[in-house]
UniProtKB/Swiss-Prot annotation:
Protein's name according to its UniProt entry: Large ribosomal subunit protein bL21
Gene Ontology biological-process entries: translation
Annotated GO MF terms: rRNA binding; structural constituent of ribosome
HAMAP family, A to Z: Ribosomal_bL21
Organism name: Corynebacterium glutamicum (strain ATCC 13032 / DSM 20300 / JCM 1318 / BCRC 11384 / CCUG 27702 / LMG 3730 / NBRC 12168 / NCIMB 10025 / NRRL B-2784 / 534)
GO cellular component: cytoplasm; ribonucleoprotein complex; ribosome
Subunit structure comment from the entry: Part of the 50S ribosomal subunit. Contacts protein L20.
Job description of the protein: This protein binds to 23S rRNA in the presence of protein L20.
Pfam families: Ribosomal_L21p (PF00829)
Keywords tagged on the record: Ribonucleoprotein, Ribosomal protein, RNA-binding, rRNA-binding
SUPFAM superfamilies per UniProt: L21p-like
Length: 101
């Protein structure tokens, strides 16, 4: 059984026992989080009806908070000597799917 959930502006296909890296979610490691905007559930049959999906939630547990890979940004203007360097690491949360109900 799997489900497609939406969190942090992205969609993820998850099944029970999966580890998923998502945009940062507030909470301590070990805390439970329910991902409610479920878009699709596939069990005995595929369900996409909004009225049936309103009662479905994906239960997860926060494993850890981490950061994504470093992204390097460079602005450069020709002939003026203007250079600007910047970097960014996106904060992420690792979730373990404990159940789909």
């Amino acid at each position: 059984m799997y489900a497609i959930v939406k969190t942090g502006g992205k969609q993820y296909k998850v099944a029970e026992g999966d580890l998923v890296k998502v945009e940062k979610i507030e909470g301590e490691p070990g805390a439970s989080v329910a991902l409610t905007p479920v878009l699709l559930v596939d069990g005995a049959d595929v369900t996409t009806a909004a009225d049936k999906l309103a009662s479905v939630s994906v239960n997860t547990e926060i494993v850890e908070h981490t950061k994504g890979p470093k992204i390097k940004i460079l602005k450069y203007k020709n002939k003026t000597g203007y250079k600007k360097r910047q970097g960014h690491r996106q904060p992420l949360t690792v979730l373990k799917v404990t159940g789909i109900k």
